[in-house]
Amino acid sequence: MKIRNRHQRMVAAPPERIAALIADFDRAWPTEIAPAPRRQGHRLYDAGPMLWEEFDRPGAARAFRVVRPEGFQGEHWFELELAEGATVLRHTVEGCAVGKYEAIWRERIEPLHDLILEALLDNVDAAVASGD
């Protein structure tokens, strides 16, 4: 099953400011929903049952490839697009789920992912508004 999921928000700040907020998961991650991914080595992040490898993707502020579980293949990334007086912060997931992971994505992971991403965008907005 193909997966494509996108969230975006117009944020009243320059791209550099937003890049600094998403460079460290602890600053914007909604820990009231789920623990922030933890660095495991140089470019690996442990997010509970998922393991991500950070990689360089042209045009992306941050990008990750799914390492585990094997039933998911794909990437997710943050992009920053300059807009008039603001920046569009966009997060995209593209990949596929196979076997039992099709139902796991639809029933558990996608709804949680949507909650986390919308809360993360709220946290970025709040940090910008407060001058954090």
Predicted segments, located by residue:
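Hydrophobic ligand-binding cavity/cleft-lining segments
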Residues: M1-G41
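Hydrophobic pocket/interface hotspot
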Residues: I18-A28, R62-F64, L89-H91, V124
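A short, structured loop/turn motif at beta-sheet edges
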Residues: A12-E16, F55-G59, E79-V88, G131
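Short, structured interface segments that constitute the first stable element of a domain
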Residues: E32-M50, L115-A119
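Hydrophobic/aromatic beta-strand elements that line small-molecule binding cavities or substrate pockets
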Residues: H7-R9, M50-D56, E75-L82, V93
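Short beta-strand segments that buttress and anchor functional surface loops
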Residues: G41-A47, R62-P69
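Beta-strand/loop substructures that line and gate deep hydrophobic ligand-binding cavities in soluble
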Residues: R68-A126, D132
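Intrinsic-disorder/low-complexity, polar/charged segments enriched in Ser/Thr/Lys/Arg/Asp/Glu/Gln
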Residues: K2-M10, A61, Q73-E75, A86-R90
